[in-house]
């Protein structure tokens, strides 16, 4: 069998500069003006950052980077990756206490941060005496100086003449930690870049010079891998959205063809289109879409959470393909990717970089882009793999003969009834997706009974004149129960006055089954 290989980030930058040259790669708004950076310029500035870092220390360092997705963030992340050091990205809203703990666990020696984190960065210097370097990313003038002083024409030019071991760790990404302590996923260059070297089932999504709007944070592998690494390979323009408050404005300014989203964003944008059509019935669907998305939108690629198939249908009525993929950081990112010929209820088709099997209902993955492990957590790493080396995703699913993947729940969330039957709470929760009275729902087991805890959409109830919310929800559940499997029958509806408790990443916290 041919050994799996993939280019390094440096090789991607070199190829991009050679192939696409002065074509625009990165666009962003600064001080009210649109600025552009070509493939050549991004390569040049990334190499300058690489030389700057190596001029500070020839020792391999773990470098934390805290900030929003701006141009300096991207060149720093690239510079770290091509310098042979290890990038460790964090969310900009991380607390000082958590950052100090994770810095210690991840052996951080250098911190790059944006202006908004400056005060906390000073506190971290006191809490983390092992930090050797700390640099503010928000200082544009400082970075322009780095780009110039460490250019290919400078005395430091030779510092970028290095060969990176593609099998060594290049990035550590901490998982959200919905259960227990956060774990640092170690990925190699081979995993990071190799994961995007798959065959696109939809050949018209990623074409050179197409415009992609990047709205999700770069510290998530879904965004960095898709909006940066893959678009660098394919020659797309990447427009940086910045704040979510600017999304609607920037959609109309940049007029993208493709946007990577989470389902919540897709739902919100759809509601805007519907509001325009409701306000003026004379407005055409095409014009309403253009008022929200601009004139070129064709694709929304969803990930990170369950996507209601009804939402897919709604978007197709607008002439937009909304499709989802599936992945996890531990697999290098993608496991399956969008395909507009696949079932709307699937998460696309498994990539040709991955092999998937279903063992006892669980989706398990074999891929050369799998993680090296959890940093300094050998026992936790071992638990993630089967005896024959397959990655355990923890998701329950089905795989068809034509490689379509379907997810039905989580292994850890299974409700095990006294008769031994396993019930996926997610499968029941999905049945509430079309009920406008339901804002949030959590299904769990309690003494061999299925409970549905619901936070209603009180605004909707008010508009529709629904006074007996409990009664209305019980009627809806009765209708569901008539066609449900015996094990899926909901015994009780509990109505909440407050939203369900969430994790740091915005996911609903699960309750343990009470036996």
Task: Identify the role of each PLM range.
Residues 21-24, 152-174, 181, 205-211:
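Conserved pre-ATP/AMP-binding loop-to-beta segment of ANL
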Residues 35, 50-94:
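Conserved AMP-binding/adenylate-forming
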Residues 36-40, 170-196:
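Conserved AMP-binding A3 loop
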Residues 118-166, 273-291:
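ANL superfamily adenylate-forming
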Residues 193-211, 218-288, 296:
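Conserved AMP-binding/adenylation subdomain of ANL enzymes
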Residues 257-261, 269-342, 439:
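Gly/Ser/Thr-rich phosphate-binding loop
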Residues 350, 357-358, 362-417, 422, ...:
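Conserved ATP-binding/catalytic segment of the ANL
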Residues 437-443, 448, 478-515:
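Conserved C-terminal "lid"/linker of ANL adenylate-forming enzymes
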